[in-house]
Amino acid sequence: MAVPVIETNNIISHPEGGCPLQVGEGTYHLKDNLHLATPPPHPSEAPIVNPNPLATVPTPPTMGVKLSLICISPRTKTPSSLPNQTVVAPPFGDGNPALAPVPVKDGLKRRKPKNNIIKSSSSFVSRVITHEAATKRLNDRSPEGLFAFANINRAFQWLDLSSKQKEEPLTKILFTKAHMLCHDTNELTKSSSHIDIVMGSSAGDIIWYEPMSQKYARINKNGVVSNSPVTHIKWIPGSENLFMAAHANGQLAVYDKEKEDALFTPEIQNQSAEALKASGRQPLQVLKSVNSRNQKTNPVALWKLANQRISHFAFSPDQRHLAVVLEDGSLRVMDYLKEEVLDIFRSYYGGLICVCWSPDGKYIVTGGQDDLLTIWSLPERKIVARCQGHNSWVSAVAFDPWRCDERTYRFGSVGDDCRLLLWDFSVGMLHRPKVYQASARQRTSMITSNTQYGNRHRADSASNRMRSDSQKTANTYESCDQAVRHPVEPRARTALLPPIMSKVVGSDPICWLGFQEDCIMTSSLEGHIRTWDRPREGISDKYNDQSSSPAISASATGSGSVSGLADSNTGLS
């Protein structure tokens, strides 16, 4: 007997006066709560009845709801504190003739995937549901409106958040068994008739999807390059075709959306026995270089960072550096154009989960299983402060570019404790703990100012210093020895930053956070997409850092009581 198909619908609610966010510049009011419908399991998938919590059988990886937002014609550009660059980073793979763009006959016309997802006979796609008035809705909408793409279990939805019927998806794709864990839109190729999206699945397969034409292509099909789940995926800045995907087996791969797949064999035949033996301890093992002349098929490049899961990565605003966080508790800063790891930092304990860059590229913020956020300085290559306020794992962190200027930075974080926290910091606000200051006065040596690496906290012994003074060679394995492994900075010597706002915003873990010009958005494990309107005052004005500057706790014990939190109302009314 056939299993009946159960249709589920999204639900939107408009709480009145519920869950306001009180900050120095005003009150953020909860506009709406869009609850995405969780699709039932595919009929061919056997339900798990009374699972044994002690079972060692691995379960399919899942993620909470993540959003990819895109606006075809935004009214204003996202503000950036990045100074005018005199030197622009070259494109990834620049100098390799095998990656030179091939001129096309169609000129500026965007290439689309070849297969129609609605008429697809692939067993990978279960069914596609399109809105009956999708064409009319697209024609009538403003190009300034916001599109959102969201994953929830085996479903992937295309939403128009500027529509009065925002709860009704333009398209809902149901996959057979695979869950889409991550996705990203290409800002460079977007137009009123074209949007490029890549999404990574729990099966390792990657989908290149163009929603306007409902065309798609399958990349890394059946795990031909890597059969490990895709944990994070992003388009490479400035590229129309190339995107980077992190796999759960510790591999970072660069794919071309228009290249075919082929059975992958690591290109390590030219490496010496000593290099192969040493590769296990090195922070980057190049299985295929972007400089390889073999570029007829995917991947364009493939790197092995560790045997543990890569949780997240983020590109720097100058499009040269890559910050990668792993389940082994490390933050690795790469010059991905040169395929080199520059620095390796460690968490206080536990794995790292999320990472982001400040708009000016000077700071990196990470969050992890130690319930802390950590601010790292890229120019100084050191920790700046630890941020204490979460009661569980930190799942996402993001800067608010509309609240950042040359002196003050605003960022937010969400976690498994169902909380949304907002943070303000400036370098002048941070003070070293008294214990550290006393010991610092006894130092007789002066830190030289003619090097940006003078403030690095690193051991002096040769065994802990991985940076070599010998001349670099072209061998990628040998260049990996240049990475500096920084020791963990004791909590007693690290400034502690409290949040300016802490709020429980739901009853299930929050897993994504985004800032827009007029709102703050979050999404949760069970599919709640919440939107808070910003205060009505002009948000384009320069931020007055005196409006909500918290007192900085830098207790030598590291406990650091966090005071002044707007947390009196932790419930949802």
UniProtKB/Swiss-Prot annotation:
Region (Disordered) residue spans: 448-481, 537-573
Keyword Repeat set for record: yes
Composition bias type Polar residues, residue spans: 461-479
InterPro entries: WD40/YVTN_repeat-like_dom_sf (IPR015943), WD40_repeat_dom_sf (IPR036322), WD40_rpt (IPR001680), WD_repeat_creC_regulators (IPR051362)
UniProt cross-references to PROSITE patterns, sorted A to Z: WD_REPEATS_2, WD_REPEATS_REGION
Any Pfam family the entry gives: WD40
A GO cellular component entry from the record: cell tip
Residues in WD repeats: 225-265, 305-346, 347-386, 389-433, 505-542
Biased composition (Low complexity): 547-564
Keyword annotations: Repeat, Transcription, Transcription regulation, Ubl conjugation pathway, WD repeat
SUPFAM superfamilies: WD40 repeat-like
GO biological-process terms attached to the record: carbon catabolite repression of transcription
Taxonomy, superkingdom: Eukaryota
Subunit organization: Interacts with creB.
Main function: Component of the regulatory network controlling carbon source utilization through ubiquitination and deubiquitination involving creA, creB, creC, creD and acrB. Required to prevent the proteolysis of the CreB deubiquitinating enzyme in the absence of carbon catabolite repression. CreB deubiquitinating enzyme stabilized in a complex with the CreC leads to the expression of genes such as those in the proline and quinate pathways.
PANTHER family linked: AT02583P, WD REPEAT PROTEIN
The family this protein is said to belong to: Belongs to the WD repeat creC family.
Name of this chain's protein: Probable catabolite repression protein creC
Organismal lineage: Eukaryota, Fungi, Dikarya, Ascomycota, Pezizomycotina
